[in-house]
Amino acid sequence: MARFPTSPAPNLLLRLFSSNKRASSPTAALLTGDFHLIRHFSAGTAARAVKDEKEPWWKESMDKLRNIGISAHIDSGKTTLTERVLFYTGRIHEIHEVRGRDGVGAKMDSMDLEREKGITIQSAATYCTWKDYKVNIIDTPGHVDFTIEVERALRVLDGAILVLCSVGGVQSQSITVDRQMRRYEVPRVAFINKLDRMGADPWKVLNQARAKLRHHSAAVQVPIGLEENFQGLIDLIHVKAYFFHGSSGENVVAGDIPADMEGLVGDKRRELIETVSEVDDVLAEKFLNDEPVSAAELEEAIRRATIAQKFVPVFMGSAFKNKGVQPLLDGVVSFLPSPNEVNNYALDQNNNEERVTLTGSPDGPLVALAFKLEEGRFGQLTYLRVYEGVIKKGDFIINVNTGKRIKVPRLVRMHSNDMEDIQEAHAGQIVAVFGIECASGDTFTDGSVKYTMTSMNVPEPVMSLAVQPVSKDSGGQFSKALNRFQKEDPTFRVGLDPESGQTIISGMGELHLDIYVERMRREYKVDATVGKPRVNFRETITQRAEFDYLHKKQSGGAGQYGRVTGYVEPLPPGSKEKFEFENMIVGQAIPSGFIPAIEKGFKEAANSGSLIGHPVENLRIVLTDGASHAVDSSELAFKMAAIYAFRLCYTAARPVILEPVMLVELKVPTEFQGTVAGDINKRKGIIVGNDQEGDDSVITANVPLNNMFGYSTSLRSMTQGKGEFTMEYKEHSAVSNEVQAQLVNAYSASKATE
């Protein structure tokens, strides 16, 4: 009996087939060829080349390290999966479920709100050991409103597990997190979860991953039974069945493949070899020559293709039923890269941001990235990924972004909301530091180099709320809470409405903002009144317009004089920058000292367009000429000239209003499809996809966010409570002429009543 221990233990040896003994069946012979293999099942050592004895000591240490994330669509079971991983690796000694059914809640959901709602809000970090491998795990949120947590996790990880639901399949947030993995070039394995659920269909989900995610993927396992008959898994690489015994599935028993499944196993292993050979030359040669492929050769090929991001191996199981988690852990260490197998780059600020390859050596200069901030019990907690060098408790380090020199007072390794003090951390490790003032995305070095890591992609907020404390005595705590939330979360913004004087909070959706209002009440004892959610419209221009404005004030005392000439034009579609300013003045028509004031004036004017008072974006301003006065010109005069010049030419540039458009995915019983589709059309949505999944219709549509308020209630009413939907931000696009006229009239009316 093969047994997976719940704590680090010597590698398990399994003798699978022998060259001097025939395979147990014709199918097994076809699948495996004749070979003799003793496998270290947990470590995947068959995939390792013989190491050079002269390799530095730290490379061997890093070979045994994995930095992985677990990402998925909401409610796909990723926190449940992480709970099992922690149990089987000996990190926790009993399993607790999501939603705190047992009064405790999952270990990685450390916030009370997370345990009550059964969702992950923040990304929790933990460290565990699987056999002789050290694994850092980030458990990330699945709800689209918390997508920045996923971005921050993937930025610093070397590999990831994409969890897919065997019933729900590839859903909208599955597509989003997969796109984020591509952006940060993160190799991944997929885990099709919930095979015990009614309607489980892993092969449908695999085909969806190939079609919707464009995954070049194949299953490395076949389930033995589905739904209530799900019993175990067949490993297609080693052609062996595994069953999960014990009260928590901790005993993994190797057995024979059921006779009625040999045909399916043969087909699926052949499909696996063929799929991998399409992206791996070594395996392709054996496949084309019709040579038998051993388990070791197949495992090596899968590892090469996965690390090169050419292949996604697909594992299966049911985390809730404690089946399939240990083989998935073996897949993590076998197929996902160690830190020294990933190319990481920094930008040298002393050399025009030239790309510098980071070796990962602890002997090199310290380079570390702050990827998450959190207010802990003992002050601000900063999560760091060390890319090169060593960071030690008591060291002085430099924040390259601010130039500040900071001492490291305390260094810890995180385990959800618990921590362990450590003395030092080497390249490749993820740790947390207390008492460092910085922003998310800042780079730290030891001062010998001036490197920065590329910044993380931070999406713009799409929704705002007016919020104010019920009691005036709560003002101090109210401000303290908002300041903390802003530092922790780059997508949470706080501003002041200049007209009403109200505090405005902005974020990625209703749930995102509701969570922060609730956290304010719980953590800071501040009750707040909340206004109606408002969409974050924007404005832009559609054509070039000239400006020539003279700001002149010379009626006694110090005068003001400044003239600016040039033009405004829209930026090309897809531009990264939202605002560009270019000074093309030849000569000294305007002294160079006044140019920054002119740019500041245009930026200030663009903060509030004249249509509905929202920010103007995708705008390029070119200054071509101007005039100054020897006595009366000043920074203020030129700033005012720029503000008035922008306002005067804005109408001539044919401005339009942009609104956030959401990608909405609905899953409804087929009998309600017509009603739901008709309602989407009434909301000015455009249906872009309509698929059938069993008795359900899956509708994909682009719908203006402004028309989606209260949609949950409407959908429940239309589908007798059987419909569900998700939505995520897609883009800002121009509103229709009719809607623009309505918005402009409403804005003008509100201004008139002030």
UniProtKB/Swiss-Prot annotation:
Q: In which tissues is it expressed?
A: Expressed in cotyledons and adult leaves at the same levels.
Question: Which superkingdom is the protein from?
Answer: Eukaryota
Q: Which GO terms describe its cellular component?
A: mitochondrion
Q: Which residues form the tr-type G domain?
A: 63-340
Q: In which pathway is this protein known to take part?
A: Protein biosynthesis; polypeptide chain elongation
- Give residues annotated as binding GTP: 72-79, 139-143, 193-196
GO BP terms = mitochondrial translational elongation
Keywords recorded for this protein, A-Z: Elongation factor, GTP-binding, Mitochondrion, Nucleotide-binding, Protein biosynthesis
Q: Name one GO molecular function term.
A: translation elongation factor activity
Mind telling me which CDD domains this protein's record contains?
EF-G, EFG_III, EFG_mtEFG1_IV, mtEFG1_C, mtEFG1_II_like
**Entry similarity comment:** Belongs to the TRAFAC class translation factor GTPase superfamily. Classic translation factor GTPase family. EF-G/EF-2 subfamily.
The entry's function note states: Mitochondrial GTPase that catalyzes the GTP-dependent ribosomal translocation step during translation elongation. During this step, the ribosome changes from the pre-translocational (PRE) to the post-translocational (POST) state as the newly formed A-site-bound peptidyl-tRNA and P-site-bound deacylated tRNA move to the P and E sites, respectively. Catalyzes the coordinated movement of the two tRNA molecules, the mRNA and conformational changes in the ribosome.
Q: What else is known?
A: This protein may be expected to contain an N-terminal transit peptide but none has been predicted.
Q: What is this protein called?
A: Elongation factor G-2, mitochondrial
Supply the source organism for this entry: Arabidopsis thaliana (Mouse-ear cress)
